[in-house]
UniProtKB/Swiss-Prot annotation:
Protein name: Very long chain fatty acid elongase 5
EC class (word): transferase
Region annotation (Disordered) ranges: 265-295
Entry function: Catalyzes the first and rate-limiting reaction of the four reactions that constitute the long-chain fatty acids elongation cycle. This endoplasmic reticulum-bound enzymatic process allows the addition of 2 carbons to the chain of long- and very long-chain fatty acids (VLCFAs) per cycle. Condensing enzyme that acts specifically toward polyunsaturated acyl-CoA with the higher activity toward C18:3(n-6) acyl-CoA.
GO molecular function: fatty acid elongase activity
GO annotation terms (biological process): fatty acid elongation, monounsaturated fatty acid; fatty acid elongation, polyunsaturated fatty acid; fatty acid elongation, saturated fatty acid; long-chain fatty-acyl-CoA biosynthetic process; sphingolipid biosynthetic process; unsaturated fatty acid biosynthetic process; very long-chain fatty acid biosynthetic process
The keyword Transmembrane is annotated on this UniProt entry: yes
Amino acid sequence: MEVLDKAVNGYIDHLLGPKDPRVKGWLLLDNYVPTIFFTALYLFIVWRGPKYMQNRQPVSCRSILVVYNLGLTLLSFYMFYELVTGVWEGGYNFFCQDTHSGGDADTKIIRVLWWYYFSKLIEFMDTFFFILRKNNHQITVLHVYHHASMLNIWWFVMNWVPCGHSFFGATLNSFIHVLMYSYYGLSAIPAIRPYLWWKKYITQCQLTQFVLTMTQTTCAMIWPCKFPMGWLYFQNSYMISLIILFTNFYLKTYNKKTSSRRKEYQNGSASAVNGYTNSFSSLEDNVKQRKQRQN
């Protein structure tokens, strides 16, 4: 393992240059191998999990989901608040901000962005809950691509550009996740589920987030500072991929609804957001079928 660590990190350092010394020794950041391992394990579970559950009953995760989504809602709010106050304290420039001129605010933002990176590892649980509940239709290309890529991208961000212009996308995303995970948590409560009307607008907010992030990134290209230009090009490329995938999801979900899907909405079931469905209809239908067979 040590030989692998040296080989992988030596190649990355040669390709990207020296890492930011301010994050040296931080959990999971010194070596890329743990991040690769967690991603590979995630993809393996995505592949094997549905097959493992194929002949098993879905697991009810209702209580766990409420707690899990509440926790991520609070963590997202904490990150959003700390990033906004850190940017204000450091006098960050919206158009372009380098990684070394914010003083103590840079240190604060680096600390918060580490939590943002770590939250992407926690969010792998989203997919695992789908597998346990046998909601395999929710494990889409968009869902897996977004989850697997974000953890890896933010490992690189934290090691080379852990503050400065990197703040904007994480700030917007943290705010969106406050809305998104609060929706997930509430939709896990049957009494509240019929009153949730804002699922469609969360996806619209996500698309708006990507466009705004591209706009802010492009500003740094037009009015450059000392923030590395290569990271800006990569950021915009990644945003384009998300816009394409999320737009495709949005059109399929909201503009081409099947009659069965419309019936589900009329019956008050919670529908998909970002490839997620928080209804427990599949589990409940399974229980009903078992009872009918027993009778």
